Amino acid sequence: PLRRQRQMCIRDSTNDARNKFIVNLAADLKGNTLVLYQFVQKHGIPLYENLNNKVDGSKDIWFVSGDTVVKDREKVREIAGDTDNNIIVASFGTFSTGINIPSIENIIFASPSKSKIRNLQSIGRGLRLKEGKESCNLYDVADDLSWKSWKNHTLKHFSERLSIYSEEKFNYKIVEVNIN
């Protein structure tokens, strides 16, 4: 069973309907949006490519991974700091900590984790205020692959993140979306 669960979890990042939902969400949001992913080849690159096809030049799309040199990461940060029509598709490892972009208005956890510190640091990217900004919206995409009494790991991790959001007194709303 552990092996099966792991395979299901990895397959989520390559689910076309799930990725289409994330792409449509990011494309429809107003302001700068940070899309955080875990797997570069399996998830980050497909999200980036699909976003480029979807927005067709109406927004600037940036891709950041561990292979992106620091100078280019800084350039993305500066551009996003000066403009408000960007989507940054970044790996958790590169943009979850140490990045200061007060103009981030939306964060999408495309492949969230259960780590409290990592999640709070990632949310912190959007909590930095700038003139005219009062809040940041977090879209925590969780997958319910439950079957009978079995609960998948990503759903369990989502439950743990909800506990964190409650502890931190974040206002949140759960919206169920059927993507099939």
Language-model region placement:
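Single conserved hydrophobic/aromatic residue that forms the stacking wall/gate
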Residues: 1-10
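Short, flexible loop segments at the rims of nucleotide/cofactor-binding pockets, characterized by
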Residues: 11-15, 63-67, 85
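Conserved strand-helix element at the start of the C-terminal RecA-like helicase core
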Residues: 14-19, 24-50, 165
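Short coil/turn segments at beta-strand junctions that form active-site/ligand-binding loops
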Residues: 31-32, 59-60, 84-86
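Long, largely alpha-helical accessory region at the distal end of helicase-like NTP-driven motors
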Residues: 32, 170-180
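Conserved helicase motor "Helicase C" RecA-like lobe of SF1/SF2 P-loop NTPases
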Residues: 34-68, 75
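Conserved beta-strand scaffold positions in the cores of enzyme catalytic domains, especially
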Residues: 61-63, 138, 172-174
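Conserved RecA-like P-loop NTPase helicase motor core
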Residues: 66-167
